[in-house]
Amino acid sequence: MPRLRPKPNATPDDLAFGINPCAMALSAGLVRSLSYLEETKNRRVFDLVDRAREEGIAVQAVTGPRLDELTAFGVHQGILVRLKTIEPVDLAQVAREAATASLVLLLDRVTDPQNLGAVLRTAVAVGVDAVVLPPRRGVLLTPGVHRASSGISFVAPVATPQNLAMAIRTLKDAGYWIVAADAGEGSTSATEFDWPARTALIMGSEGEGVGQLLLRESDFHVALPMDPRVESLNVGVACGALSYLWRRRWPLAPRSD
């Protein structure tokens, strides 16, 4: 009977593994050191090793068992990096300097790394100005999030204020309207909602939704219209749909280049 491997949930937060996350970490200038599988024949791994050496980053070849141990048997594809500190963005500064049309995402009790990874990919694709992650009410940037986002987590504008109530006050002071995703009675259909130019969108976990305190702090509640046989959507999927509804109302300015 094959031995079951433990899930990669015991790795330190200053690690990333897998080809795409490691490549993004290198591009973002966040790599302190790199380890790779000594018997690898993967050309993409060799390319990343060469890049790291050219940038003066410490590189080490390790055995397969050692790489498995370092990643807690995660799907590492033969490469792992240790990270520098990922500095959060200053939410107040972002709010002050954002364009007239600006979207900020606030995540309440989102604990699944896969969901956060999906949200961060959506955020960068849509052009969100900040993703607010409260330190005590959900998952932060972990190896699982880096892998789920294919490394987009290294370039996503993540803010980590003390709590979401404080973040909401900061955003309201900067002219944002607070919109909560809520499937409860009285919510406006998200497809018919007139999205404000400056929107702070609160997303809750699939199981619990947005907390009551945050719902009371919100200016509007919106819900995605769905077939009644579907009780709820994954927060990553719902966030993508709502973010693009906002972007449809407030398109990105054409690139000058």
Give each language-model segment a name.
Residues 85-87, 136-138, 207:
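Short glycine-enriched loops at secondary-structure junctions
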Residues 23, 28, 125, 144-152, ...:
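Structured adenosyl-cofactor binding patch, chiefly the S-adenosyl-L-methionine
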